[in-house]
Design a protein with these regions (language model features):
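Solvent-exposed soluble domains appended to multi-pass membrane proteins
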Residues: 1-254
């Protein structure tokens, strides 16, 4: 299903025992960027009075002099995402309305992944700003109704994931040819797990088992990390590697 990711996992730091903290994008996004636990019956992203008090990766990086950007091909106001992103340090947001009408309607959720990956590649290749930068990108095509412009697998669910994998593989291979690659760190992490194949209970560990991969010229050598970890641990781990303060992330472990 994911030959490109499988190939790339041998080129970077691959965390094999990472688990998602929730079952929805709004929860998983807060878990990832703020290291804050997902709640079963409430979305912190929808509660600005709470979310604006949380630490965040973008906030920490911006204080260290990084330019911060966020790209999503869908409605960035959905589940109050825009408010959360702006309050946690993202300086520039790009969403569906920044694309043509045809591109905005290429998927039920917005702009298909091949279009946004192409946009991101051009943005990174042509970036002129001095100093460090951080760009986050949320894909959307590997989501129900799983209708994508790609037909390698008969079952539409794994086919949608295979499509995003194809987009990722081509993107990384092209990025390797740019001057930015030698200093670049690319982190691949799902927002949540997915119940497929639909066998057994959605409370089973495999429902929450997700991959985490660090790639790029900034990675000294490939390695596999089998230590069990949670999605919330990304914040402290990343900031710790950068030598930045991360004690505010109470639930995140380096």
């Amino acid at each position: 299903m994911t030959p490109h990711f499988n190939r790339l996992s041998k080129e970077g730091v691959f965390f094999t025992n990472c688990y998602a903290n929730s079952f929805r994008t709004d929860r998983g996004t807060v878990c990832t960027f703020s290291g804050y636990l997902g709640l079963p019956t409430a979305s912190v992203m929808k509660i600005p009075a709470k979310s604006r008090t949380l630490p965040a990766i973008a906030e920490g990086l911006s204080k260290a002099g990084y330019k911060t950007d966020f790209l999503y091909g869908g409605d960035i106001n959905f589940t109050n995402m825009k408010s959360y992103l702006l309050s946690t340090g993202y300086q520039r947001l790009t969403a569906n309305t920044d694309f043509s009408l045809a591109e905005q309607t290429s998927n039920a959720w917005g702009v298909n992944d091949d279009i946004t990956f192409e946009y991101l590649y051009n943005q990174l290749r042509n970036r002129k700003e001095e100093g460090p930068w951080h760009t986050a990108f949320l894909t959307l095509s590997s989501h129900e109704p799983f209708e994508v412009p790609y037909h390698r697998l008969e079952d539409k669910i794994p086919n949608a994931f295979a499509y995003t994998d194809e987009c990722l593989g081509k993107f990384v291979d092209r990025l390797k040819q740019t001057p930015a690659w030698k200093d670049l760190l690319v982190i691949c992490l799902p927002d949540h797990g997915f119940y497929y194949p639909r066998e057994g209970s959605n409370a089973m560990p495999r429902f929450y088992h997700i991959p985490l991969l660090w790639l790029g010229g900034a990675v000294k050598q490939p390695m596999q990390v089998d230590k069990i970890m949670n999605q919330t641990d990304l914040a402290a781990t990343l900031l710790g590697q950068l030598g930045l303060e991360h004690t505010a992330f109470t639930f995140s472990r380096n």
